[in-house]
A protein has these predicted regions:
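Extracellular beta-rich repeat passengers
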Residues: 1-158
């Protein structure tokens, strides 16, 4: 796939259990804008996901959802999957048309108009991320992997 991230459950039986259910927060995913490998995050084959405080850019399709089982996991009736405070540079690509770009944009803090305006290739953060009360997470008030006030990548080169 050459994706920035691909999450699958079972390609032969998308309804198979146990269901793959990654939980990720404070993620920055940057593609190289190549014409090949156009997907950023690919959710498919029945996977569920919780993704919070993320930036996705540099791919023609920043976020693709595939298979009815995966797309239905975002429905208000089931809702085991959550996408909140996600900023990306393209609209969501829905293969089945069940979970649409309008549904994504209606989610808390989601946007499809993110523009990397920095010229040095560094993707900065966007303030106002979700506070996660689960002790598994370290609290952060920003989206992405790097705080503007504490750049742990300072000095890195591309």
């Amino acid at each position: 796939c050459d994706c920035l991230m691909e999450c699958d459950n079972n390609g032969n039986n998308a309804a198979a259990t146990p269901v793959a259910h990654p939980v990720l927060a404070n993620v920055t995913l940057v593609g190289n804008n190549s014409a090949a490998g156009t997907r950023g995050v690919r959710l498919r084959a029945g996977t569920e996901v919780e993704l919070y405080n993320a930036i996705i850019t540099g791919k023609a399709k920043c976020l693709t959802v595939e298979t009815a089982e995966t797309e239905n996991s975002f429905s208000k009736q089931q809702n085991p999957s959550v996408l909140e405070y996600i900023s990306m540079s393209t609209e969501l690509d829905s293969q089945e048309g069940i979970y649409t770009n309008a549904d994504f944009e209606a989610g808390a803090g989601n946007a499809t108009d993110y523009v990397n305006t920095l010229t040095d290739g560094y993707v900065g953060t966007i303030q106002g991320g979700k506070t996660l009360s689960d002790s598994f997470f370290t609290a952060a008030a920003y989206k992405g992997a790097v705080s503007a006030s504490d750049d742990w990548t300072a000095g890195w080169t591309l």
